[in-house]
From Swiss-Prot:
SUPFAM superfamilies named in the record: Histone-fold (SSF47113)
Subunit text: Belongs to the TFIID complex which is composed of TATA binding protein (Tbp) and a number of TBP-associated factors (TAFs). Taf9 and Taf6 exist as a heterotetramer. Interacts with e(y)2.
Name this protein carries in UniProt: Transcription initiation factor TFIID subunit 9
GO CC annotation, single: transcription factor TFIID complex
Domain comment (free text): The C-terminus is important for mediating interaction with e(y)2.
Function of the protein: TFIID is a multimeric protein complex that plays a central role in mediating promoter responses to various activators and repressors.
Biased composition annotated in UniProt, kind: Gly residues: 200-210, 241-259
Biological processes per GO annotation: follicle cell of egg chamber development; RNA polymerase II preinitiation complex assembly; transcription by RNA polymerase II; transcription initiation at RNA polymerase II promoter
Alphabetically ordered keywords of this record: Nucleus, Transcription, Transcription regulation
Acidic residues compositional bias, start-end: 269-278
Organism of provenance: Drosophila melanogaster
Gene3D superfamilies: Histone, subunit A (1.10.20.10)
GO molecular function, one term: protein heterodimerization activity
Stated family: Belongs to the TAF9 family.
Length: 278
């Protein structure tokens, strides 16, 4: 009996040194028939209750300020408690509410299944059969950065073209030439001839005769220079040649021959001048 009295005295002494909030937690655990628990459980429950009550009071203060109240009212605390319960302590809906939602959902018919469809699989992004890798080439081309390309001079190498039948010949690069055609001037020579008839008196027994002479005026004729606009140089020479002057002989009078002008056209080839442009 003395031992039991001493244990009760120790327990009562320990309870006196425990804070009032901790005593409330211990009494709640005792009512729930929780006999064995660690001492730190009480401290954890105290922290939880302190945080919960603080949040409730802060929300109640916000509601009171919104209603322009100077102090927190019981209605503000109840509203804050309901909002916190709906937000923190969520639970399933009531049975009759779930039944109504299920009836509405089941009234909607499912989409028909197409006959040509095979295995019903979700989209590719949700399947594990999709390819999520890429093959890497064994011989990857080397990539040069922009700075390396700018610092290195560029060289152009021309490979000779080899044919299967003929020998290999080096490939030469020929600069492109531009041909400029200059129209050639046309030179025309014009000569004029004059025919003169001179009368001569014969002897006493003979009759009189006439002498025909052909003369060309001008030492070299008239020179005319023209430029052909069609780049085709055609030279035309108009000349007149007189046949030799005949002398009159015999008694009845002599006849003379006159010169006939013949037009000669000669076509000259077109000359081309080549200018090499870089």
């Amino acid at each position: 009996m003395s031992a039991e009295k001493s244990d009760k005295a120790k327990i009562s002494a320990q309870i006196k040194h425990v804070p009032k909030d901790a005593q409330v937690i211990m009494s709640i655990l005792k009512e729930l028939n929780v006999q064995e628990y660690e001492p730190r459980v009480v401290n954890q429950l105290l922290e939880f209750t302190f945080r919960y009550v603080t949040c409730i009071l802060d929300d109640a203060k916000v509601y009171a300020n919104h209603a322009r109240k100077k102090t927190i009212d019981l209605d503000d605390v109840r509203l804050a408690t309901e909002v916190t319960l709906d937000k923190s302590f969520t639970g399933p809906l009531e049975r009759h509410v779930l039944a109504k939602v299920a009836d509405v959902r089941n009234s909607m018919p499912l989409p028909p299944i197409k006959p040509h469809c095979g295995l019903r699989l979700p989209p590719d992004r949700y399947c594990l059969t999709g390819v999520n890798y890429k093959l890497r080439a064994t011989n990857q081309p080397k990539k040069m950065t922009k700075s390396a390309v700018e610092g290195r001079p560029l060289k152009t190498v021309v490979k000779p073209v080899s044919s299967a039948n003929g020998p290999k010949r080096p490939h030469s690069v020929v600069a492109k030439q531009q041909v400029v055609t200059i129209p050639k001037p046309v030179i025309k020579f014009t000569t004029t001839t004059t025919t003169k008839t001179v009368g001569s008196s014969g002897g006493s027994g003979g009759g009189g005769g006439q002498e025909v002479k052909s003369e060309s005026t001008g030492a070299g004729g008239d020179l005319k220079m023209e430029v052909d606009s069609d780049a085709a140089a055609v030279g035309s020479i108009a000349g007149a040649s007189g046949s030799g002057a005949g002398s009159a002989s015999g008694g009845g009078g002599g006849g003379g021959s006159s010169g006939v002008g013949v037009a000669v056209k000669r076509e000259r080839e077109e000359e081309e001048f080549e200018f090499v442009t870089n």
